[in-house]
Amino acid sequence: MAKKIDKKLPLDVLLNHLKEYKDAVIILGPDIAKQNISVEEETSKDCFNRKTMIKNPQKFWKYYTENLMKLYSYQDITTETVEALLDLNLHSTVIDTNIIDVLTHTSVISPAGKNKRLECVKCHKAYNAEEMYHQLKFQDTTLKCSCGGNIKPTVLCFGEKYPMNIYNQVKNAIFTEEKGKVSLNTHTLIFIGVDFSDSLISEIIDSFDALKDMNHYTVVIADKDHREDVIYYNPEFGVCDDIGQGVSRLIDLLNK
């Protein structure tokens, strides 16, 4: 785990830094999606049995329509503030660890990949769960592929692991390796509502921390209820009443 930074990063330094280098990798965590969502986050083991739902697509779609679509719906204010952040002429790559990618005007990498982990059991063609959801329209039916095979969720649909190609996409967004030497592709990492116990997040932080110099910064926007999980902690900036407020604050400061 990366060491804590004792010295507070002045806001004017951060703002000048972003305006000068015009780049950032923005990592979105589960807290930004779950904020203010009044839906039960966990269902009973009987309702959420992975093996059962993989074998029985109807149970998967029932769970998906009743829980996942609601749980991971982004609040309008959060979506607007994050999109505004990406429109500040920054060369940005977003790593979205949530279930649905709703951001535009930027390159989005989704490590969880849950919305792309449906496939035909016959020809193994991949399908997007969100698109299938809209086709389903709450009907209790089995979706068919053009080849005639049934479309079913895979184990990866439930976020049990990250496939290696996703690891490589994430690493390539932040790091470059040439002739055995690793360098950074971005000057700024911005974490918004992330889970620092996630192995991928920890690896990113440790690697970035080992390579960065005075021209590289890490920014954390987190709820004050989660500040004990923040590795890079800035009392003046990182703690807010909510994540949306934190992003809005950054946007306001950048626009000054």
Question: What is the predicted role of each segment?
Answer:
Residues M1-K256:
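Conserved catalytic alpha/beta core of Sir2/sirtuin-type deacylases, generalized to analogous enzyme cores
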